[in-house]
């Protein structure tokens, strides 16, 4: 009589190993996709971003009469006033940093810890671009970690001028308004190349809360902060 061989089934530990391997492979594949996409964008302009796609879907559901406004313009066709204003407002050390500002990150960490939730990110221009291109508006430490990884990829594969060019053409400036050209037309009926210092300062101040300031254009804070940024613009160092 032939003995029947008993086939052992994978135990919980082995299943956990399999699951961990699948998760690790998926994570690595995602990072490889981001890396390859950024490499391509050195030569090809992004047609859309994660934020744009999210807004397009939201508008199709809530405001079908509206659509995303976005027109790409080359770096040299964007006013130096706007470039200086954004650097003065968002990331004064943009040209010289490596995509991170350690002091700002630590300050944000302390504030978030005190509040018990993420209320501030301490983001540089490159970090903002990483988030806009690939991530969601959700605030979590996992998303922040991914943002830092993508920031490293951007700084590794692109020079500062290319990072800033993509940022200027993809950053959100209102309800469905993306990029300097669309913002210039939307708020001032002009082109990105013709923005004045005062207009540029105002647009720069809107960036942390573009939808709010789109609806509250008469905000005293917006007017006061714009004057401050206008005074700082002359000291802003550009990457070109």
From Swiss-Prot:
Cystine pairings recorded for this chain: none
EC number per UniProt: 2.4.99.28
Gene Ontology biological-process annotations: cell wall organization; peptidoglycan biosynthetic process; regulation of cell shape
InterPro entries tied to this protein: Glyco_trans_51 (IPR001264), Lysozyme-like_dom_sf (IPR023346), PBP_transglycosylase (IPR036950), Pep_trsgly (IPR011812)
TM helices/strands, residue ranges: 15-35
GO molecular function, one term: peptidoglycan glycosyltransferase activity
Catalytic activities: [GlcNAc-(1->4)-Mur2Ac(oyl-L-Ala-gamma-D-Glu-L-Lys-D-Ala-D-Ala)](n)-di-trans,octa-cis-undecaprenyl diphosphate + beta-D-GlcNAc-(1->4)-Mur2Ac(oyl-L-Ala-gamma-D-Glu-L-Lys-D-Ala-D-Ala)-di-trans,octa-cis-undecaprenyl diphosphate = [GlcNAc-(1->4)-Mur2Ac(oyl-L-Ala-gamma-D-Glu-L-Lys-D-Ala-D-Ala)](n+1)-di-trans,octa-cis-undecaprenyl diphosphate + di-trans,octa-cis-undecaprenyl diphosphate + H(+)
Primary location: membrane
One cellular component (GO) term of this entry: peptidoglycan-based cell wall
Listed NCBIfam families: mono_pep_trsgly
Name of the protein in question: Biosynthetic peptidoglycan transglycosylase
Native organism: Paraburkholderia xenovorans (strain LB400)
Gene encoding the protein: mtgA
């Amino acid at each position: 009589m032939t003995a029947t061989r008993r086939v052992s089934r994978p135990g919980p530990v082995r299943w956990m190993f399999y699951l961990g391997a699948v998760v690790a492979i998926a994570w690595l594949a995602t990072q490889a996709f981001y890396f390859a996409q950024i490499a391509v964008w050195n030569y090809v302009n992004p047609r859309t971003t994660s934020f744009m796609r999210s807004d397009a879907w939201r508008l199709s559901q809530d405001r079908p009469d509206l659509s995303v406004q976005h027109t790409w313009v080359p770096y040299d066709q964007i006013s130096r006033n706007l470039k200086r204003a954004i650097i003065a407002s968002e990331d004064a050390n943009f040209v010289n940093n490596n995509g991170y500002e350690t002091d700002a990150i630590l300050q944000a960490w302390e504030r978030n810890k005190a509040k018990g939730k993420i209320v501030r990110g301490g983001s540089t221009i490159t970090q903002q671009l990483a988030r806009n291109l690939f991530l969601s508006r959700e605030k979590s430490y996992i998303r922040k970690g991914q943002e830092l990884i993508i920031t490293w990829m951007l700084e590794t594969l692109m020079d500062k001028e290319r990072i800033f060019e993509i940022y200027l053409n993809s950053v959100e400036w209102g309800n469905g308004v993306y990029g300097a050209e669309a913002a210039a037309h939307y708020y001032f009926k002009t082109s990105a190349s013709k923005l004045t210092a005062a207009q540029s300062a105002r647009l720069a101040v809107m960036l942390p809360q573009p939808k709010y300031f789109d609806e509250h254009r008469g905000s005293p804070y917006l007017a006061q902060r714009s004057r401050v940024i206008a005074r700082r613009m002359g000291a802003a160092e550009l990457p070109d």
